[in-house]
């Protein structure tokens, strides 16, 4: 329905764009201008459009924002990159949505800390690193992390790959 489409685009697409625009004057004055967007790498697999069309389009528009702004802002010394979880993350969306698997899915997820640690690595890179799409896992491997078990909600449990990978 159009109401759902409008809502997810208002939050995801427009919200991300508006936040970036509002931050630009401050980022332009900074020697450490960085934008990190929670956006998936673009994988044009029809399975992501089946039943989640409005949400998927809104998330992919955020991915396009990363590509566009990284090109536009590179000469201003502002890096724009994206991060996306490699596995499901224990969030309220996963925990309380039975359609996503509820408690069983939580057990097969990682803690939110993995995304925070990966974001720290991405944001600490040279500002010439821009227009990149990282998974939390790939960013941490790049940072030298080898033990990912500490991020598991239930260590030893097989992990659920994220839905957009």
For each feature predicted by the language model, list its residue ranges.
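Phosphate-coordinating loops and pocket residues in cytosolic domains that bind phosphorylated ligands
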Residues: 10, 29, 95-96
